[in-house]
């Protein structure tokens, strides 16, 4: 028997262990270094429940309704209940779509459900049986629902919704596709196995959800990798290599840009504010799919952070990422 005292090499593996039905799954990560599975499990759980993006109805315009406290003849639910039902509709959009209007128009009696929406290519209603309203007698019922991609801020969305037309009603959107997360740790002797229970709304695959959570968490902590404590050993004064302004280390994903703008910058490998400020307006306009509206949005974000375009920072990425 070989007496090898070198540290065991861990070859990580993530896989779907079990499909429990009703969009509930078990995802297994192994092997995990001894003592780290609980830390990893807690981190994955918190990110899954707080930080994944998704699509949600953000506003609705119902025919013959002026405000959310209205009632409709021959409709069992009031408008507040209808809006609450619309919030529960699970919508999956192609990555190229970040906002669109969905139309619903029926003339019947009985239950109006999410399956009555007219969908186009790249749009899928997951829970078609989700009730929206109940028509007690045959009548016309129509509405326009605006769907947007976003990410919750805190528990639910805090993103303002523009009400442009008479009768527009804001919906308290819940963008997060994850509904429940739990985890369990198994001891393998010299390593651990982490099993994550994930319940989604059906718009995201479980492995993709866990992978995105890990990627997002890594992005958030990566900015601290280049931090160092001064050689005098004082613990209360943490310095950043090359005295970079900390605001420049802010990840682009934290700027609450629209999905289109964020995707354009990500495709250009612009990860931090420090990357972004080094571009000029003309350089940004050359980025594929980044138009004038996105440029104005980016400029406003920079103004809000007391920054501007066209700033030169020598070797910024190398200094930040230690390359």
From Swiss-Prot:
EC number: 2.7.7.6
Region (Alpha C-terminal domain (alpha-CTD)): 244-323
Annotated stretches, region: Alpha N-terminal domain (alpha-NTD): 1-228
Catalytic activity: RNA(n) + a ribonucleoside 5'-triphosphate = RNA(n+1) + diphosphate
GO function terms (MF aspect): DNA binding; DNA-directed RNA polymerase activity; protein dimerization activity
Stretches of the chain forming a coiled coil according to its record: none
Any one Gene Ontology cellular component term annotated for this protein: DNA-directed RNA polymerase complex
Enzyme class at the top of the EC tree: transferase
GO biological process: DNA-templated transcription
Record CDD domains: RNAP_alpha_NTD
Residue ranges crossing the lipid bilayer per the database entry: none
Signal peptide feature range: none
Family annotation (SUPFAM superfamilies): C-terminal domain of RNA polymerase alpha subunit, Insert subdomain of RNA polymerase alpha subunit, RBP11-like subunits of RNA polymerase
UniProt entry keywords in alphabetical sequence: DNA-directed RNA polymerase, Nucleotidyltransferase, Transcription, Transferase
Matching HAMAP family: RNApol_bact_RpoA
Quaternary structure and interacting proteins, as annotated: Homodimer. The RNAP catalytic core consists of 2 alpha, 1 beta, 1 beta' and 1 omega subunit. When a sigma factor is associated with the core the holoenzyme is formed, which can initiate transcription.
Domain notes: The N-terminal domain is essential for RNAP assembly and basal transcription, whereas the C-terminal domain is involved in interaction with transcriptional regulators and with upstream promoter elements.
Protein purpose: DNA-dependent RNA polymerase catalyzes the transcription of DNA into RNA using the four ribonucleoside triphosphates as substrates.
Similarity field: Belongs to the RNA polymerase alpha chain family.
Name used for this protein in its record: DNA-directed RNA polymerase subunit alpha 1
Native species: Francisella tularensis subsp. novicida (strain U112)
Classification lineage: Bacteria, Pseudomonadati, Pseudomonadota, Gammaproteobacteria, Thiotrichales
């Amino acid at each position: 028997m070989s007496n090898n005292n070198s540290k065991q090499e861990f070859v990580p593996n993530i896989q779907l262990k079990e499909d429990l039905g009703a969009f509930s799954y078990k995802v297994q990560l192994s092997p995990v270094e001894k003592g780290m599975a609980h830390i990893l499990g807690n981190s994955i759980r918190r990110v899954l429940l707080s930080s994944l993006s998704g699509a949600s109805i953000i506003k609705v315009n119902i025919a013959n309704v002026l405000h959310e406290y209205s009632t409709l003849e021959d409709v069992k639910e009031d408008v507040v209940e209808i809006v609450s039902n619309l919030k529960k509709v699970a919508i999956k959009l192609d990555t190229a779509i970040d906002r669109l209007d969905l139309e619903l128009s029926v003339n019947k009696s009985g239950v109006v459900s999410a399956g009555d929406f007219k969908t186009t290519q790249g749009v899928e209603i997951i829970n078609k049986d989700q009730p929206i309203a109940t028509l007690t007698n045959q009548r016309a019922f129509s509405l326009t629902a605006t769907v947007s991609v976003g990410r919750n801020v805190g528990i639910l969305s805090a993103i303002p919704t523009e009400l442009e037309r008479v009768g527009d009603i804001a919906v308290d959107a819940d963008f997060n596709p994850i509904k429940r997360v739990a985890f369990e740790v198994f001891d393998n002797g010299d390593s651990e196995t982490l099993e994550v229970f994930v319940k989604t709304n059906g718009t995201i695959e479980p492995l993709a959800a866990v992978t995105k959570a890990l990627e997002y968490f890594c992005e958030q902590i990566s900015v601290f990798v280049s931090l160092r404590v001064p050689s005098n050993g004082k613990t209360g004064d943490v310095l950043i290599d090359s005295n970079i302004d900390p605001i420049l280390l802010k990840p682009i994903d934290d700027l609450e840009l629209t999905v289109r703008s964020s995707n354009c910058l990500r495709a250009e490998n612009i990860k931090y504010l420090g990357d972004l400020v080094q571009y000029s307006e003309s350089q940004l306009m050359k980025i594929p799919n980044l138009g004038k509206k996105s440029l104005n949005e980016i400029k406003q974000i920079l103004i809000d952070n007391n920054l501007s375009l066209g700033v030169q920072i020598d070797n910024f990425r190398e200094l930040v990422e230690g390359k």
